[in-house]
């Protein structure tokens, strides 16, 4: 990735999309391999579009492309983000540290997962939003249930 200009301020966040076709290898190793490949290609593409040009235009184009992909009815879009190691439970803006953190999902969002450290730091919470059909499958996965607790209570 190229260095950002000296007069650039703020944070730049982007996403990497790994497009999987029906005939692609859908095993975990195949998916990880595809994400790594697409991450490399993203870096190369980003380097090209920002060289000598206006970085804000490159950012706008990236956001526009992502929006088209994420809202397409022809694509099953899955989004996973991790807030782990951000030490969010240590943040205090003057009214005290948070008791419990959660992402905000709308009713219409599906196929979204957000990983967050537990307050005590001994585990990870996975906040997941799925369609009703996928939720039923997810909640009946015996192997998954061995390692999880659905809807844990807030420990203060």
Residue ranges of predicted features:
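Acyl-CoA-dependent O-acyltransferases
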Residues: 1-156
């Amino acid at each position: 990735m190229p260095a950002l200009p000296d007069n650039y301020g703020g944070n730049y966040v982007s996403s990497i999309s790994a497009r999987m076709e029906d005939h692609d290898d859908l095993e975990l190793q195949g998916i990880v391999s595809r994400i790594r490949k697409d991450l490399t290609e993203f870096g190369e593409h980003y380097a090209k579009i920002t060289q000598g040009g206006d970085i804000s235009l490159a950012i706008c184009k990236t956001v526009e492309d992502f929006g088209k992909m994420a809202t397409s009815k022809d694509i099953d879009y899955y989004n996973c983000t991790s807030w782990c190691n951000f030490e969010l439970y240590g943040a205090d803006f003057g009214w005290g540290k948070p008791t419990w953190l959660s992402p905000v999902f709308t009713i219409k969002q599906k196929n979204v997962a957000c990983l967050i450290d537990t307050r005590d730091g001994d585990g990870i919470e996975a906040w997941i939003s799925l369609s009703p059909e996928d939720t039923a499958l997810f909640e009946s996965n015996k192997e998954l249930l061995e390692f999880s607790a659905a809807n844990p209570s807030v420990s203060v």
